[in-house]
Amino acid sequence: RNVSKTFNPGTINEKAALKNLHLVLREGDFAPIVGSNGAGKSTLFNAITGAFYADRGLIMLDGEDITYQMEHVRSKVIGHLFQDPLKGTAPHMTIEENMALAYLRTTTSKNAYFSRIKAADKKKFREQLALLDMGLEDRMKQPVGLLSGGQRQALTLLMATMVTPKILLLDEHTAALDPATAEKVLSLTKKIVAERNITCLMVTHNMHQALELGNRTLMMDSGNIVLDITGEERKKMTVDDLLEQFAVRAGKALDNDRILFSKVEGSNS
């Protein structure tokens, strides 16, 4: 609610990353976000997760003011995937151990310890891994570092949603994967988000994904949301329409080469 964040204030490197940004998400909203370079997409995510505090404004989650809540407290109810598939897991720990840590991170019990993961929990881990259809349920004792990038990102997605988060943040989580693996992880994402009715924000550079996934398309520029497209308007909208509306609202054309290239790729597919 009216969130602002400025880095290096009062210096020649001053950068207003978020400018009075206002966004209300309804429960179950799945909203892809696209935007120009430096639009504030990752800054928005970092403000939500508590990586830093907003200078002004309020961040509310499920009716609770979390604006100045510690990052580790928020992590119990916020799922977050990064572009780098290596960021979400501990490579020297086994698949089972990584899942146990993710499970314990979300618990509110003060008596939850790593050694207290029960056989029933391990059985549940195995069942959840089987849903990925990657054979990881038979490799639970193997270090995560032996997995491919796609397998690690799929595992991270599973870990982030083992206990349904109040919001799931996906920061270009398929961008570093090969096309086939990216499609599989994206398919898993759609399935999990839909089945759990998870409220989700997903940064993407793919304009077609931005219009086809979820129920809402957001476009950012210069630290604010300049477009919020839903309903029938979104269903009828083409990528060219979206780019045209962005130019009108932002007062300039989109300057993200990756996004513009995805438009060409989509038209040739």
Positions of predicted regions on the chain:
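ABC ATPase C-loop
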Residues: 160-161
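ABC ATPase NBD coupling module
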Residues: 11, 65-79, 87, 111-118, ...
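Conserved ABC transporter NBD signature motif
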Residues: 57-64, 227-229
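A short, flexible loop at the N-terminus of ABC-type nucleotide-binding domains that lies
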Residues: 6-20, 70
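ABC ATPase nucleotide-binding domains
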Residues: 235-269
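H-loop/switch region of ABC-family ATPase nucleotide-binding domains
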Residues: 204-205
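The feature captures the beta-strand-to-loop junction immediately N-terminal to the Walker
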Residues: 34-36
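Helix-to-loop junction immediately C-terminal to a conserved catalytic motif
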Residues: 49
